[in-house]
Amino acid sequence: MRPILLSGHERSLNQIKFNRDGDLIFSVAKDKIVCAWWSANGERLGTYNGHQGAIWTVDVSPNTQILATGSADNTVRLWNVKTGECIKVWDFPTAVKRVRVHPPMEADCWPVTEKRMGFLGTIAVLDINYGENLTEQAEEPSLRITCTESKATVAGWSYMGKYIIAGHEDGSVSQYDGKTGEQLENVQAHEFDHQINDIQFSADRTYFITASKDKSAKLMSTRNLAILKTYVADTPLNSATITPKKDYVILGGGQAAMDVTTTSARQGKFEARFYHKVFEDEIGRVRGHFGPLNTVHIHPAGTAYASGGEDGYVRVHHFDKPYFDFMYEVEREQLRK
């Protein structure tokens, strides 16, 4: 499984995303630009320029028409994917750490803002117009959720936009009503005061995986926030994703970036870890990055995954035949029946 190495950023990666078709990858880093790549061969299509600070987050609409980014310059920007034109800028009082586009095409985009300078962290819902005139967008959020106790660090939409699921700085996970913003549930999923760094959903959005500084990832139900599975690692985790074709999850993390120069790549545990989704066993690791993995994302068809690291590189791995052939004995017996 030889990786394709994508070198287009001067600083560490913050987030990478495949589009729904899986033919494009979008990456953002601390260097103010958004890169678009062909996933098949790693060729760079182009960049989106305009932010004045580190870009923390990126997401793309299901039809790959609109790209949304959030930055340390306190703005959310909407881009026309095809032309690279910035079509809308929303200003916020603090940095925008996460932005998500709701899967249904007619729905919303929303940012998670930082708790800083006297401002509380918020989750804001922005209505997106997918019509012919993309520049005509709403000026103000249609819904704003204020996180009074512990700031939200990551969040995502559930199935049908019924809930907003948020991960918090104190290791808890909250469920909010998608229409009113009312908090319905709050569960201490991870150790107290160990921040949740990532939440990624299954294809049908009925369950999701968290990645936390407490060296574990949790598979949780969207409906009631029940913890379904726990994957224990030996290093703090920054990102986790669920593979659609095989029953695996991929975790990414590593020793804290400030300690990286004092250690070798192996000691730093800078590897993508593969766990069996059902049995919770670690089944393999993929090395390559020199520095922690900050973000991992799976191809929608489950045929490849991409990882972005503190070293400034994106690595795209297309899975070989042995990846798809590997099965536990109990899985083989199930097929024989």
Curated annotation (Swiss-Prot):
Question: Which parts are the WD repeats?
Answer: 8-47, 50-91, 147-186, 191-230, 288-327
Coiled coil, from the record: none
Q: Which Pfam families match?
A: EIF3I
Q: Transferase: is it a keyword of this entry?
A: no
Please provide, alphabetically and separated by semicolons, the GO molecular function terms listed in this UniProt record.
Answer: RNA binding; translation initiation factor activity
User: Which UniProt keywords are present, listed alphabetically?
Assistant: Cytoplasm, Initiation factor, Protein biosynthesis, Repeat, WD repeat
Intracellular or extracellular location(s): Cytoplasm
| Recorded superkingdom | Eukaryota
> One GO CC term of this entry?
eukaryotic translation initiation factor 3 complex, eIF3m
Q: Note the SMART domains from the entry.
A: WD40 (SM00320)
One GO biological-process annotation of the entry reads:
formation of cytoplasmic translation initiation complex
Q: Which family does it belong to?
A: Belongs to the eIF-3 subunit I family.
Subunit (UniProt): Component of the eukaryotic translation initiation factor 3 (eIF-3) complex.
Family matches, as PANTHER family: EUKARYOTIC TRANSLATION INITIATION FACTOR 3 SUBUNIT I
Q: Per its database record, what is this protein's job?
A: Component of the eukaryotic translation initiation factor 3 (eIF-3) complex, which is involved in protein synthesis of a specialized repertoire of mRNAs and, together with other initiation factors, stimulates binding of mRNA and methionyl-tRNAi to the 40S ribosome. The eIF-3 complex specifically targets and initiates translation of a subset of mRNAs involved in cell proliferation.
* Protein name as catalogued: Eukaryotic translation initiation factor 3 subunit I
Q: What is the gene name?
A: tif34
